Amino acid sequence: MSYQKVYNDWKQDPLGFWKNQAKEITWYKAPDKILDDSKKPFYNWFTGGAINACYNCVDRHIENGKGEDIAIIYDSAMCKKVRKISYLELKQNVAKLAGALKGKGIKKGDRVIIYMPMIPEAVVAMLACARLGAIHSVVFGGFASSELAVRIDDCNAKAIIAGSCGLEPGRIVPYKPLLDEAISLAEHKPDFCIVYQRDELRADLIEGRDFDWNDLVSEADEADCVPVSGEDPLYILYTSGTTGQPKGVIRPVGGHLVSLNWTMKNFYDVHPGEVFWAASDVGWVVGHSYIVYAPLVSGTTSVLFEGKPVGTPDAGTFWRVISDHNVVSLFTAPTAFRAIKRADPKGNFLKKYSLTSLRTLFLAGERADPDTINWAKDLLQIPVIDHWWQTESGHVMIGNPWGIEKLEIKVGSPSVPIPGFEIDVLDENGNILPPNQLGSIAIKLPLAPGALPSLWKADDRFVSAYLSKFPGYYETGDAGLKDEDG
């Protein structure tokens, strides 16, 4: 089937298109409505019904006989260790932590901040919240106390789950002093904190407020999945606001799972049992979507990498990870490849490894300059696919839909709109510009399932930040142009 056919099918019957995609994930009860547009300009997909993200990402694969399949490959260049976690083991760890949280009073709708490094326990913490219907808000590990405090106050976090430290090349970053300072700065005080003690640095715990992860989990019962409505928030992810107050992007559970599941097969062309590696951090949107929820909901294996593209120990680290784990597709930011290119311009480190498993390299997160794209393409001898999206969208908006049709790659362009997004380039007055004229990239409402329905406790700010400039459109804040091919 061609891209144009799929895109036209969506455009002619968007509700039918997404209703079909919703059947690919498991609902305890089907949604009451595919799209609720009764409160325009606020739109909600898959309202009512009953669903659980953790069930879809973990339990259902076990029930389908895939429990021994590997869910996560943890590869730490910092600790020089590799750990493979099956779906079965992941479920046990998640259900135990969820039981510990439940035992301490965490329930559906409560907010839990996660402040952790790139270790499997970060994923376990996210899924444990999802299992209970609690709303997680992951804050990048090591982020400043003042920023963490603002987030504690904004979401009224009932609990915080933290790691004792993060690891950077040549140094250990203690997280606990940053966490203690943030709680002292915050007006709202969480009920309790759970601290995962890493061997590299153990944190001092405050009696009565802080609890050791292993102690709590060892005494906990396994908790079952709690059904939530399709439009309920799975998480809040804060983006840095230009005005100082960060914006809490809400991610609705039903739409997010449906669209992520669709992208793994149709966009990234990665399938159950294959190994996908998003070289990002769970603190960013790429980590939420493509280290955790998309690979797991689709039953693929996700690489969780703790390290850097260079210096841990050298510019061959990415090639080692791909070779060791048979990665079929790598998704990273152009910055990572620029760093590798600077350190090893001739690609000598590549000669030490076999990358026969690698089919595609996907780039996003910033502009991919032609130099970097061409260098990577010449070195790896595989397609290098730029794509464009935002924290707000949760998944790709413009890209080359590799799993549907492999379109010609135009270096410097992320390619075509993805089903779910009707995208125009507008002038200052909101008129659609002809081809090859630079203007504001704007997206017709409603946005695709999984994109933000609003900002946390800030509907007015959502409207003023995104919807006020071009009525009927979402303003992306980015500039661009469309060529004659769209």
Give the predicted meaning of each segment.
Residues 1-85, 89-92, 96-99, 183-189, ...:
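N-lobe entry segment of adenylate-forming
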Residues 424-445, 482-485:
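Conserved beta-loop-beta connector loops within the AMP-binding
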Residues 127, 131-215, 326, 333-334:
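Structural core segment of the AMP-binding/adenylate-forming
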Residues 68-70, 193-196, 206-238, 245, ...:
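Conserved pre-ATP/AMP-binding loop-to-beta segment of ANL
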Residues 257-275, 285-329, 342-349:
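Conserved AMP-binding/adenylation subdomain of ANL enzymes
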Residues 54, 72-127, 144, 148-149, ...:
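Conserved AMP-binding/adenylate-forming core of the ANL superfamily
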